Structure formats: C-alpha cells, structure tokens
UniProtKB/Swiss-Prot annotation:
Residues 1-34 have a biased composition (Acidic residues). Keywords: Acetylation, DNA-directed RNA polymerase, Nucleus, Phosphoprotein, Transcription. GO terms for molecular function: DNA binding; DNA-directed RNA polymerase activity. Belongs to the archaeal Rpo6/eukaryotic RPB6 RNA polymerase subunit family. This is DNA-directed RNA polymerases I, II, and III subunit RPABC2.
Length: 127
C-alpha cells in the first residue's frame, strides 16, 4: 500500500462545493442553439400557405440532419439508397442527403411562436 491510498473511503466528495458557473455555461449553450426541430417524416407537416424562411438548408440543419440520420442508420434503420460497399453510417447519411432521400422533416420556429415545416427534399442544399 502506498502513502497516497490511506483514507479513500468515498466520503471526500461531500466536501466539494458545487460550481455555480456551470449554470451560466448551460444557459449560454441553450441560447446559441438554432430554433430548429427534427421530425420523423411520418408526422404530417403543417400546411403552409406562404413560407417566409429561406429555402436553403443551413449548415446547422445539415449537421443535425446528418447526425440524426447517421444515428438512425447505426441503429439498423432501413437505408434509402443503394449501398456500394459503404459501412460508415455518416457516409451513408451523406449519400442519402445528396440523393434527397432522407425521411426527415425540419421544423423551423419563428419568433411569433408559429413554425414552418420543410422536408429535406424541398430544401436547397449547398455543398
């Protein structure tokens, strides 16, 4: 037994004060997030008479769609494109996005509390 292992019975953690700065960090992360929600394509989108948001997919929406779809593929969701030896879920998700076959609806919230639903196939994707 070494000199450093004398009194480690797990009670030492009770003496540590909680850091109050963590709450500020969590709030800052929440404020920085874009007002976007990812919906499964089974849910019917809201019928929009006139859309006011941009028809371009933002880099944040692209990242979230690719991450969500890659997670679904990793959990054995059916793949919507033909595979040519790809095994990486992220590469498969990128291939699906390029083919506009991702079954996800993006919900964009507006400042007045309303929202617009956009299918991935409706958005203009810049590479």
């Amino acid at each position: 037994m070494s000199d450093n292992e004398d009194n480690f019975d797990g009670d030492d953690f009770d003496d540590v004060e909680e850091d109050e700065g963590l709450d500020d960090l969590e709030n800052a992360e929440e404020e920085g997030q874009e007002n976007v929600e990812i919906l499964p394509s089974g849910e019917r989108p809201q019928a929009n008479q006139k859309r006011i948001t941009t028809p371009y997919m933002t880099k944040y929406e692209r990242a979230r769609v690719l991450g969500t779809r890659a997670l679904q593929i990793a959990m054995c969701a059916p793949v919507m494109v033909e595979l040519e030896g790809e095994t990486d879920p992220l590469l498969i998700a990128m291939k699906e996005l390029k083919a506009r076959k991702i079954p996800i609806i993006i919900r964009r919230y507006l400042p007045d509390g309303s929202y617009e639903d956009w299918g991935v196939d409706e958005l203009i994707i810049s590479d």
